[in-house]
Regions:
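Radical SAM/AdoMet-radical enzyme domain recognition
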Residues: 58-183
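N-terminal pre-core extensions flanking Radical SAM catalytic domains
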Residues: 1-57
């Protein structure tokens, strides 16, 4: 039995090798399915300097052009995409057009529009328009159990501010009976 499994395993590896390296393989001629989710890097600016992130080393800061962002969103929907993430290397709440991006994603028909944030800028003034635009979830990257750890990880003493913002978002969501994930 062991020898049979070894042979099947070896044959499987040989078949994979042939598919990968043989010129007549269909591996490189087939088109993979369009992804279910797209992530738009709407900006690459951040208000924190987390020790694990490459962002503090970026020497050029920019934002994604609105027309390009909306066109990419449209292409995603046209190709069967269902989820839209509005973040990547930057802090989404540094982007003044964030509510517009969320609203456009929902208008186009994305089932799930979300963002990740360090939470320091997710103030009621900035978060309310994003929530009201239809954001399906806001994920907080707190990365710490207490104030001291937070400062060590994030490079700033914003722990109290982040927890206040998180609490406000929970309260607003619950008071308005909004179906939105907060993580």
């Amino acid at each position: 039995m062991l020898d049979k499994n070894k042979n099947e395993w070896a044959e499987s590896l040989e078949n994979r090798r042939k598919m990968t390296f043989d010129a007549d393989s269909t591996l490189f001629t087939s088109v993979p399915p369009f992804p279910r989710e797209i992530t738009l890097d709407i900006n690459n600016r951040c208000n924190h300097k987390c020790f694990f992130c490459a962002n503090p080393k970026i020497d050029h800061y920019d934002s994604l052009d609105t027309d390009i962002a909306f066109d990419l969103m449209k292409q995603g929907i046209e190709n069967g995409c269902t989820d839209l993430a509005l973040q990547a290397t930057g802090e989404p709440f540094m982007e003044k057009r964030l509510p517009d991006f969320v609203a456009e994603g929902k208008r186009l028909g994305y089932e799930y529009v979300y963002l990740n944030t360090n939470g320091a800028l997710a103030t009621p003034k900035r978060a309310k328009p994003v929530i009201d635009a239809g954001c399906d979830s806001i994920k907080f990257s707190i990365n710490a159990n207490n104030k001291k750890e937070f400062e060590e990880v994030h490079g700033y003493d914003d722990f109290d501010k982040v927890t206040e913002n998180l609490k406000w978002i929970f309260e607003y969501r619950n008071s308005q009976k909004i179906k939105m994930g907060v993580y």
